[in-house]
A protein has these predicted regions:
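Mature extracellular or exoplasmic CAP/SCP-family domains and secreted bioactive peptides
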Residues: 2-265
Length: 265
């Protein structure tokens, strides 16, 4: 006699929980060379396309400390800005405050270029002459903020996003900027490209400040190793022991009632 359906269902559910608690993450890490190149290239591409042209737009380069801060915050899977951006030396040893842009979308459609395009396209709501914004413009103005010359980004797979109910299996993309932009002034000075540069080289209409001292290597406090488990993970952690207890209990009951029954593959 075989009694397998009930136990097979429990086993499959347990295996499903185990295997899908942390889906295979194909999104790049902050040390991925192509990801770094894509982030820097996309930012500089859009910074060189501003209209009217910018006379003082710096060419961005990667900052590992900003990327670590972005990663630490992205891992929380919360759709809101980092609460420590204005706290001195909390998220970066040099820049205070730190700028931040966030993009969240379905993981299967994520790309750095798509996210940057969405931010840059906010230019349609921004009037450069009056600094007025008819809708959302803050992501655009931070991307093209002339004096922001360092960027660090991270993307995190999130089963769910806090503050975005009903949104599942998302790519949560965060970019941090130093120094921060979005002050109550224009994001850049209009004029002949690079005419506002000092001794910097002019590359693709951007002032290349490669001689500027590099910020020190830094691991933000939020990135120190600590256990991490989102809401989906917590649910699975609770359900798996429950299924195990049910399986053991059911096995014991069946063995008591039918001592000669056995299971086989």
């Amino acid at each position: 006699m075989k009694i397998t359906s009930f136990f097979a269902a429990l086993l499959l559910l347990d295996l499903f929980s185990c295997c899908h608690a942390y889906p295979q993450d194909t999104l790049p890490d902050i040390e991925d060379a192509k990801f770094i190149e894509d982030c820097v290239r996309a930012h500089n591409k859009f910074r060189s396309k501003v209209n009217p042209p910018a006379s003082n737009m710096y060419r961005m380069s990667w900052d590992a400390a900003l990327a670590k801060t972005a990663k630490a915050w992205a891992k929380k899977c919360i759709f809101k800005h980092n609460v420590y951006l204005k706290v001195p030396r909390k998220v970066h040893p040099t820049f205070t405050p730190v700028g931040e842009n966030i993009w969240t979308g379905t993981a299967t459609i994520f790309s750095v270029d798509a996210a940057l395009s969405d931010w840059f396209n906010e230019v349609s709501s921004y009037d450069f002459n009056t600094r007025s914004c008819s809708h959302v413009c803050g992501h655009y103005t931070q991307v093209v903020w002339a004096e922001s010359y360092k960027v660090g980004c991270a993307v995190q797979f999130c089963n769910t996003i806090e503050n975005m109910p009903g949104f599942f299996k998302a790519a949560h993309f965060v970019c941090n900027y130093g120094p921060a932009g979005n002050y109550p002034t224009k994001p850049y000075k209009a004029g002949q490209p690079c005419s506002g540069c000092s001794n910097e080289k002019c590359i693709d209409k951007l002032c290349d400040w490669d001689t500027r001292p590099q910020p020190p290597l830094y691991v933000p406090p939020a990135e120190h190793p600590h256990p991490f488990c989102d809401q989906y993970c917590l649910t699975i952690s609770i359900l798996r022991p429950l299924f195990l207890v049910l399986s053991v209990g059911a096995t014991f009951v069946v063995q008591q009632q039918f001592p000669h029954i056995f299971f086989y593959e």
